Amino acid sequence: MNKIRKGDQIIVLTGRDKGKQGVVSARKDDSHLLIDGINMVKKHVKPNPMKGTTGGIVEKAMPIHQSNVAIFNAATGKADRVGIKVQADGTRVRVFKSSGAEIKAA
């Protein structure tokens, strides 16, 4: 079970975007996340008439490692750690470590 999922509100812990908040838009693999508006870089794109794209400089989000982000707890207004709790019926749910409150699915 991934502790950080698509749609989660996160906060960046390290790097040039430290302190910024965003929403996870995709998981690139088991350890990298794509976050809207975070880790933006400028890429030079060649024009390609076959695809109908014009050339130029495009700004896009690049993946960031999940160890550099933490889930944002709206109740406390701070970054928090995620734990897994097994309920009585055997299902596993994600909870905030600080409060024990269940993390709502996005």
Curated annotation (Swiss-Prot):
GO cellular component: ribonucleoprotein complex; ribosome
GO BP annotations, alphabetical order: translation
SS bonds (residue pairs): none
Entry keyword set: Ribonucleoprotein, Ribosomal protein, RNA-binding, rRNA-binding
Record CDD domains: KOW_RPL26
GO molecular function terms noted in the UniProt entry: rRNA binding; structural constituent of ribosome
Function of the molecule: One of two assembly initiator proteins, it binds directly to the 5'-end of the 23S rRNA, where it nucleates assembly of the 50S subunit.
Subunit description: Part of the 50S ribosomal subunit.
UniProt similarity note: Belongs to the universal ribosomal protein uL24 family.
Protein name: Large ribosomal subunit protein uL24
